[in-house]
Swiss-Prot record:
Gene (name only): mob1-1
Name of the featured protein: Probable maintenance of ploidy protein mob1
GO cellular component entries: cytoplasm; medial cortex; new mitotic spindle pole body; nucleus; old mitotic spindle pole body; Sid2-Mob1 complex
Similarity field: Belongs to the MOB1/phocein family.
Domain of life the protein comes from: Eukaryota
Organism, as annotated: Neurospora crassa (strain ATCC 24698 / 74-OR23-1A / CBS 708.71 / DSM 1257 / FGSC 987)
Pfam families: Mob1_phocein
Molecular function as annotated in GO: protein kinase activator activity
UniProt-listed InterPro entries: MOB_kinase_act_fam (IPR005301), MOB_kinase_act_sf (IPR036703)
Length: 219
């Protein structure tokens, strides 16, 4: 599966588009560059807070695009290790298999290999980001009333990519030297969801619940 292009949007804090790198997706060097620019240092709890005077929907939009880019690059770094043969189902642990459903092509929950699921997911998120009716490209244009609910759904679905990577590709992440970047990116994701009440229930974190609890206690 070819790597996705990182979204460039006026709301993206770091406008970074990785070069195409073939089957292997984003390179480790690219990911390190982006992580250093995006994550920085200091308390991640402070990073995720709504800045004084900032519109909440604008802040949700900025971070949604940024996390899409981070997940895109993390998964892009390990795509050659995630195939229909190695990952015939989109799973975290055996208890958590994710089925794809949308309003156009898959109106019923559909089982598919992890790469196909993730491609559908990232294309769906990209489609929402590119939709002017959902995410106006000009800052100051009002968001639709349905935007907060859509953001919750997007964050819930993007979490599944983190869960799949942690449960099925963590050894490869360590071999590539990307463990700190995965952990920092995911911790920021967890803290952002916690800060802005985006979790949709007590079972939201499922297979990574213990890791999430640890991250919430440590910041």
């Amino acid at each position: 599966m070819s790597s996705f292009l990182t979204t460039v949007n006026q709301r993206t804090r770091n406008q970074f588009r990785p070069r195409a790198s073939g089957k292997g997706g984003a390179t480790s060097y690219q990911l390190r560059q982006y992580a250093e620019a995006t994550l920085g240092g200091g308390s991640l709890r402070k990073v995720v807070k709504l800045p004084e005077g900032e519109d909440e929907n604008e802040w949700l939009a900025v971070n949604m695009v940024d996390f899409y880019n981070q997940i895109n690059l993390l998964y892009g770094a390990i795509t050659e290790f995630c195939s229909p043969q190695t990952c015939p189902e989109m799973k975290a642990t055996d208890e958590f298999e994710y089925l794809w459903q949308d309003t156009e092509n898959y109106k019923r929950p559909t089982k598919m290999p992890a790469p196909a699921y993730i491609e559908q997911l990232m294309s769906w998120v990209q489609g929402n980001i590119d939709n002017e009716a959902v995410l106006p490209s000009r800052i100051g244009v009002p968001f639709p009333k349905s935007f907060p609910a859509l953001v919750r759904q997007i964050f819930k679905r993007m979490y599944r990519v983190y869960a799949h990577i942690y449960c099925h590709h963590y050894p490869v992440i360590r071999e590539l030297g990307l463990e700190p970047h995965l952990n920092t990116s995911f911790k920021q994701y967890v803290l952002f969801i916690d800060e802005h009440n985006l979790a949709t229930g007590k079972d939201f974190w499922g297979p990574l619940g213990d890791l999430v609890d640890s991250m919430l206690r440590s910041d």
